[in-house]
A protein has these predicted regions:
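A conserved acidic beta->alpha catalytic loop
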Residues: 68, 82-90, 105, 136-137
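Acidic helix N-cap motif at the loop->helix transition within catalytic regions
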Residues: 60-64, 87-95, 141
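Short, acidic, metal-binding catalytic loop of nucleotide-sugar glycosyltransferases
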Residues: 67-76
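Short beta-strand-to-loop acidic/aromatic patch adjacent to the donor-nucleotide binding site
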Residues: 124-137
């Protein structure tokens, strides 16, 4: 059976055996399941969750995310929204019998999330909504952990605990290096920073990562998910929770999910650029308001700016001294070079700069190799410093761009490995 209404082509009936979809405007819906959802319960087992998987040209990985979700949820509780995909993303999803909504114009991730929530009235039919990236797979204990945290009525959002997917056989040397670097970064950030930020007496976490996190429906109804002008959605959604005092952000290691990191330096550059630009754009949008959240955020911003400046300055000084040391008379003959070289090396010889930049960072890598039981990190860690410098450069470069550029949130998919 088919039903037409303005802007929507609807194929009723769950599963791959539904009618062929029709195009009636901006939205194409392929399969629709039951819209049943219980009221908010006190026991974790009573809490109903919907799963949203926004996707744009994700045919390489969408099957893995759906399979992971189907192992933990009924098929009628899973909703894929294909945001103007030019590949077979929507067809692959529809064959699994889950709900699929296909957007005919690229709205971006935030717009896709907003569209599927509205189309299926998810915040009216479920107690919470899990937003899952198409390249992410859930740990078997994820749902139980999320429900346990949502059982606390003060919790507005449950932050996923990110673990870098480690499949070295599918990656080049550069891809393995990026994955190892990200694994170290996520481990340190979550255990040394974010657990403290999400403690119930602090509640100052500035990011609920959009790769695999749950929002309470009552909080989602109050949020402006897609305000426009932002390149990504997850910083804004987290700021909305704090700015509108919708509740606290919770995080625990029992909500693990495995995320696929970029395979190339080009995709890494694009991803970090988007994340960093999105962070500064969100600060521009929400501005400052009196709160412990902003007090903690101010300290974090100060740390990011100062550390990035120091890292880049030390790297430039190291390059300057190295050229003077090994470049010979040709370099020293340049105007003012010898005077500058003498002044810098009087306080910072090349050995001190090299040790300061490399040794502390590599010690962290050695510890991570022991914790993870992955000796290969000792090799990849030799090349982490250039990635750290790239992160520092992008953190500073995106500050002025956040105030001078406007983004529409549209996305393009990076290189993926088939799930």
């Amino acid at each position: 059976a088919r039903e037409q209404r303005e802007g929507v082509g609807r194929a009723a009936g769950a599963g791959a055996g539904g009618d062929t979809p029709t195009r009636g405007g901006d939205v194409l819906e392929r399969a629709e399941g039951d819209d049943e959802g219980g009221a908010e319960g006190h026991a974790p087992s009573d809490i109903t969750l919907a799963v949203i998987i926004p996707a744009h040209n994700e045919e390489q990985v969408i099957a893995g995310a759906i399979s992971s979700s189907l192992s933990l949820f009924n098929h009628w509780d899973i909703y894929v929204v294909s945001d103007s995909s030019a590949d077979s993303t929507a067809e692959i999803a529809a064959k699994t019998g889950i709900n699929v909504l296909e957007l005919l114009t690229n709205r971006g991730k935030a717009g896709a999330i907003e569209a599927v929530i509205e189309e299926f009235s998810l915040t009216e039919n479920y107690d919470g909504v899990l937003i899952l990236d198409a390249d992410t797979e859930l740990h078997p204990g994820y749902v139980e952990g999320a429900r346990r945290q949502l059982a606390d009525p003060d919790v507005a959002a449950v932050s996923g605990f990110v673990v870098s997917e480690w499949k070295p056989d599918e990656r080049s040397f550069v891809g393995r290096m990026i994955s190892a670097y990200r694994d170290r970064l996520y481990f340190m950030l979550q255990y040394l920073l974010r657990f403290g930020q999400t403690w119930r007496r602090t509640n100052v976490s500035f990011i609920v990562p959009g790769f695999a996190s749950v929002y309470r429906s009552s909080a989602l109804r109050e949020m402006d998910i897609n305000p426009g002008g932002l390149v990504i959605e997850d910083f804004n959604m987290t700021f909305e929770v704090h700015h509108k005092r919708l509740g606290r952000v919770s995080m625990n290691a029992d909500t693990k999910a495995y995320s696929q990191d970029p395979f190339t330096l080009k995709d890494y550059y694009k991803q970090v650029s988007r994340w960093t630009l999105g962070f500064w754009q969100t600060i521009r949008r929400h501005r400052v308001w009196p709160s412990s959240f902003w007090a903690a955020l101010s300290l974090y911003i100060l740390e990011v700016v100062v550390v990035s400046l120091v890292l880049l300055l030390m790297a430039l000084l190291g390059l300057f001294v190295a050229l003077g040391t090994y470049g010979g008379d040709t370099v020293m003959a340049l105007p003012f070079y010898e005077e500058g070289f003498t002044a810098v090396t009087a306080f910072l010889p090349l050995s001190v700069i090299a040790i300061g930049l490399f040794v502390p960072d590599y010690i962290l890598t050695c510890l991570m190799a022991m914790i993870r039981g992955r000796p290969s990190y000792l090799l990849y860690g030799l090349f982490f410093l250039p990635i750290r410098l790239l992160d520092a450069f992008l953190a500073l470069r995106m500050i002025p761009r956040a105030w001078t550029t406007t983004s529409d949130g549209r996305w393009s998919s990076p290189v993926r490995a088939r799930s």
